[in-house]
Amino acid sequence: MSTSASASTSRSATAANREVKPLNGVDTPTLFATIDAVRNQPELAEFRFRATNQWLDGTHSRTTIEAFDGAGGTHSHRNNEVYAADHPAVLVGADHAPTPVEFLLHALASCLTAGIGNIAAARGVKLREVRSEIEGEIDLRGILGISDEVRNGYRKISVRFTLDGDAPAEKLKALVEQSTARSAVFDVLTRGLPVEIEVRA
């Protein structure tokens, strides 16, 4: 083989390697390595996420998320993430941003979707579309103090997924089932947890 032919073959192989993308955008070797590492060193599984919130005006506030602890160290996000929250005018706000309960819907939907992507990649299923519609029903008589018999939060949340991928419907549905079984946000919403409130004044 000539030198030019060898160089051409090398360039073609390099280009082909660059074109190979992880299935569903998930780095499965790292995913499996992480699972093995945590299995062997359970202390690596301990994480602490945190955020700071600042009141701006009325029902408008801003939350900043910068870093978290886990895997034996402290990690900074690539960008300091800032999220605003407010109430719409009908709820005596200025509608600068979504309401906190709408962010809760976002948290649940995005957590389930992330799980679906990871699980599909681990099972060798290529996804073409994952879309969800999520709704929460709430009776404001609770938070307005009108009735102690009405809970303050959502009484029901409904999620409808549409999936398209290289697998039969049963396997696609199984992805959602497994994601739900392992979702941190779903767990918090359906099982609850203690919340500690400290006040400094």
Residue ranges and their predicted role:
Residues 1-106, 116-201:
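Extended beta-strand/beta-hairpin segments
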